[in-house]
Design a protein with these regions (language model features):
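Metal-associated gating/positioning segment near the N- to mid-region
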Residues: 102-173, 194, 205, 257-263
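Active-site neighborhoods of metal-dependent hydrolases
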Residues: 210-224, 228, 273-419, 494-498
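Divalent metal-dependent hydrolysis catalytic cores, especially in the metallo-beta-lactamase
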Residues: 138-162, 179-186, 216-228, 246-248, ...
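Acidic, glycine-enriched loop/beta-strand segments at the rims
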Residues: 39-44, 57-70, 83-84, 404, ...
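Histidine-rich, glycine-flanked metal-binding segment
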Residues: 34-48, 57, 62-104
Length: 498
């Protein structure tokens, strides 16, 4: 995905208070299978009782960090958080001295895919043969997500839904490593889709039947796509809501305001793809501008922006920020892709990324400044939060291949800080806010006694220096501590292959 000529990009490239707090909960953490052979090799800590001592706690609520705490984990849950001076860990099965380290909630990724985009026969002249395809990354993506600290993820659109459901089953059973998963069904896309691997809806009845079929098979959310009609979207929303399931959307044919009034629960990509002001926008048809014009002409102080944000907040519509997928086209001065991310890619994936990056750099200057649009979207996301809106976060690992699972989630948090949020606010958006949207805020998303022990241990202090969020060493999921580096090393050079 890119800022300039977003529609063309999709059609051609993407086709796409911390004193002593005792445990108040008697119920155990959600049952998970004991780690099997394929999982045990990545387990660094597995004990009935673990105490993280002298650690800095960033609790995910947006509150200031608390230094020198002891966090106790038992039975997959956090059982206490105490000032280290007031606590004794002598009877712990495992004690970790974490001076100089921070612990925060596991990331709740809300726009995380399990596929990768390929352009067949892409060559140095930047030409390729149609169609753009989305091969499944069932092996590499879950390890990358978990290794980077993503302990819960929403797939936010599936191209191999049975594979995603079976992957979730095997992760939950302890057979494979990976995060907790909210499996989104196949894309709810209209007849004009440029993706061969998406269903092409022909009627509202099609939409209803698709939702009901996949809800029966275990899907827990749905995503509408760019060419869906209002009638089809309404049918899908109604069918999902009858099952207690939510619908999000990366829209174009339907405007944000229309979708909110139809009852949608979430809108993807911040404010990049709202088309309500686009010239020549026809009902149920994606505009040529695909939202660029609207973003350019909707500063936060405008009547249109204030009215839209008011509508979204009144209808309890969340917004998913996906800044990394737009960053590559946001002008010069952007940091290069991290070496760890490049190392995760196959040689072919790296080559394709470099070709596509060069094509972007050598393309004629767009009429609308991409850097301005990137900044404008950040301003609108801040205005949405200031108005009481629920902002959640994810990376969208698609585009030209430079948004990598897990690493992209970390980068999203860094970019939220660039957007003007404080580090602890950005961490809340990427943790507790996502849990709140999913209705799981009592189980995950923040560090509190009684909650699941889904935690990230990292060297440094991301509450002051957000880039320290990259220094992940241990990821706890349901109280089991995974070795981040081992997970990442296990898929080095494999992302883009499987």
């Amino acid at each position: 995905m890119r800022l300039s000529r977003l529609r063309r990009w999709f059609s051609v490239v993407c086709v796409a208070a911390l004193s002593c707090v005792e445990c108040m909960a008697a119920q155990p953490a959600a049952a998970q299978g004991a780690p099997g052979t394929a999982v045990r090799q990545f387990v660094r800590i597995a004990a009935p009782r673990v105490v993280l001592t002298h650690v800095r706690v960033i609790d995910g609520t947006g509150a200031p960090a608390s230094d020198d705490r002891n966090v106790t984990i038992e039975g997959g849950r956090i059982t206490s958080i105490r000032a280290a001076a007031d606590a004794s860990a002598s009877d712990a099965a495992v004690t970790l001295d974490l001076r100089g380290y921070s612990v925060m909630p596991g990331i709740v990724g809300m726009h995380n895919h399990l596929f990768y985009l390929v352009r067949p026969n892409l060559n140095a002249q930047k030409k390729f043969d149609p169609p753009v395809l989305a091969p499944q990354m069932t092996f590499s993506a879950p390890r990358l997500y978990l290794g980077a600290g993503v302990t819960t993820m929403r797939t936010t659109g599936s191209v191999e839904t049975y594979a995603d459901l079976n992957l979730k089953r095997d992760i939950d059973a302890g057979k494979l490593p990976g995060p907790h998963m909210d499996v989104t069904g196949p894309y709810l896309e209209g007849a004009e889709s440029f993706f061969l691997q998406m269903p092409h809806l022909a009627s509202p009845e099609d939409a209803r039947q698709l939702v009901e079929y996949w809800a029966d098979h275990g899907v827990t959310s749905f995503k509408a796509y760019m060419n869906i009609t209002r009638a089809e979207l309404k049918a899908a929303i109604d069918a999902a809501h009858k099952r207690g399931l939510k619908v999000t959307g990366h829209l174009c044919s339907v405007t944000y305001k229309e979708a909110a009034e139809l009852g949608i629960d979430d809108l993807e990509h911040g404010f990049f793809v709202n088309t309500q002001l686009d010239p020549g926008k026809k009902p149920d048809v994606c505009s040529e501008s695909a939202g660029e014009y609207t973003l350019d002409h909707m500063p936060p102080e405008s009547t249109e922006a204030k009215d839209l944000i008011d509508t979204l907040v009144k209808h309890h519509v969340a917004i998913t920020s996906t800044l990394p997928v737009f960053e590559g086209d946001a002008g010069g001065g952007r940091p290069p892709l991290r070496q760890q991310a490049l190392d995760a890619m196959t040689p072919e994936a790296r080559e394709a990324f470099f070709i596509l990056r060069q094509r972007s750099a050598s393309s004629p200057a767009p009429k609308i400044d991409p850097a301005m649009l990137f900044k404008r979207n950040m301003e609108l996301e801040r205005a949405f939060v200031a108005a009481g809106g629920l902002l959640i976060a994810g990376p969208d690992p698609t585009g030209r291949g430079d948004v990598i699972p897990g690493f992209g989630d970390q980068r999203e948090i860094e970019l939220l800080v660039e957007a003007g949020f404080t580090p602890v606010e950005a961490i809340k958006i990427a943790t507790l806010n996502g849990a709140t949207y999913m209705g799981k805020e009592k189980q995950i998303g923040s560090i509190a006694a009684g909650k699941n022990a889904d935690l990230i241990v990292m060297k440094g202090d991301p509450s002051k220096k957000i880039s320290d969020i990259e220094n992940v060493e241990i990821v706890f999921k349901d109280g089991v501590g995974f070795d981040s580096q081992k997970l990442l090393d296990s898929v080095k050079g494999r992302y883009g292959q499987y």
